[in-house]
């Protein structure tokens, strides 16, 4: 059979058209050394900083160092599977993480993979873990409150939507407890239909013990708070690269809510361990060490993360992302490198002191040096009305109390001030995992500031407060409802509250 030259040409053209040359092109390098979770790769001349590469075993790596003849990558996963001489290929993509409402109620790792045994997460939306923080024009000032349910914080150190408020203190002073209480306190808003009141929560555990995180997850499940919470986990046993990535991944999950007109709260527990993980990576990558052996860009490490928390303008949907970073200090030293860095980045700090904790003042908030740089802009009017003088009264009490230690002969006015201060301290005490609705907080603080507790023995103040709130919930719910809806104490509400308190205190004192 003789083929026509035209037919031969057609057959060849068809065959050539079917060959996809581009799909065959891959940029491949080789591992020249590997150890301690770091791989040095030769042959990836065009690779970008922050790009994901794939090793022969399927393990992913993140490019962090670009040198003249090689690149340095941190291995995200089991680095024992990576061997010298293995091929490494470029993905031409930066690190992305799964985002969306499908993640709510789930526990995921630093790369967004589920680790709770509840099956796959169904979401089609991905985001880069490193995103640029919103600019000045895209933001608006913080003006709406985030109710933590903790009297000492909501009254004296208010947190607003879009704020960055640092929780700082020694180990075992109740830092995580404040964060968990804040998550639990959002349950009431989620039980209502108004979307603008709901705050979705993300808890990021960096370098924590698995047992500790399991307890927190169980507590959130028992309180019914996991329905609106995402837990991101990079425990102490995981690679430093995953501990380094975890907060950025979680922040991208929070930005999904922020950029879609919703409100989110993210807790970084804790950034001290995050800085240690980054120091470990930097030293292994042979980057020059600075103060306390941290690399030179450790400030930028946290500033680029915390700047992503923002209250967006109306044009951008009016959503918000609030950040509560946690820092652990050593023996109360807040002048160390990482604490001072994060204090300068955030919009205020809540100082927790072990001395107060051991005295039984819990939450152990030092009201004198704790501050919210947003201030009363993040409080409802009713709270401003009752709590305006509390900080000053507590400061005067501390001064008088320290002065009274030098002598017992005090004039009646000073004695009265000290007694009043002691009762204020008592009324601000609160049990763990018992967040208090804002309207009940307002009643409690009103009772304290208006000196209704003067006739109640100090050891009975807590008992009195519980009895009073139980009574007002049962028989005078209209007062609480009025405060909640009006968001301020009108003359009418105040008259009703005064009448109730006078009758209740009279009856209570008879029982004593």
Swiss-Prot record:
The UniProt entry, under Gene3D superfamilies, shows: 2.40.30.20, ATP synthase alpha/beta chain, C-terminal domain, P-loop containing nucleotide triphosphate hydrolases
- What PROSITE patterns does the database record attribute to this sequence? ATPASE_ALPHA_BETA (PS00152)
EC number(s) from the headed UniProt entry: 7.1.2.2
What are the UniProt keywords, alphabetically? Answer: ATP synthesis, ATP-binding, Cell inner membrane, Cell membrane, CF(1), Hydrogen ion transport, Ion transport, Membrane, Nucleotide-binding, Translocase, Transport
Q: Which residues bind ATP?
A: 169-176
Main localization of the protein? Answer: membrane
Residue ranges of the TM segments = none
Q: Which Pfam families match?
A: ATP-synt_ab, ATP-synt_ab_C, ATP-synt_ab_N
Is DNA-binding included in the keywords of this UniProt record?
A: no
Q: Where is this site: Required for activity?
A: 370
Its GO CC terms? Answer: plasma membrane; proton-transporting ATP synthase complex
Enzyme class at the top of the EC tree: translocase
State where the protein is found: Cell inner membrane
Q: Name one GO molecular function term.
A: ATP binding
Q: Which reaction does it catalyse?
A: ATP + H2O + 4 H(+)(in) = ADP + phosphate + 5 H(+)(out)
Kindly give the membrane topology term recorded for this protein: Peripheral membrane protein
Q: Which NCBIfam families match?
A: atpA (TIGR00962), PRK13343.1 (NF009884)
* Assembly behavior: F-type ATPases have 2 components, CF(1) - the catalytic core - and CF(0) - the membrane proton channel. CF(1) has five subunits: alpha(3), beta(3), gamma(1), delta(1), epsilon(1). CF(0) has three main subunits: a(1), b(2) and c(9-12). The alpha and beta chains form an alternating ring which encloses part of the gamma chain. CF(1) is attached to CF(0) by a central stalk formed by the gamma and epsilon chains, while a peripheral stalk is formed by the delta and b chains.
Q: What does this protein do?
A: Produces ATP from ADP in the presence of a proton gradient across the membrane. The alpha chain is a regulatory subunit.
Similarity comment: Belongs to the ATPase alpha/beta chains family.
Quote the protein name from its UniProt record. Answer: ATP synthase subunit alpha
Gene name as annotated: atpA
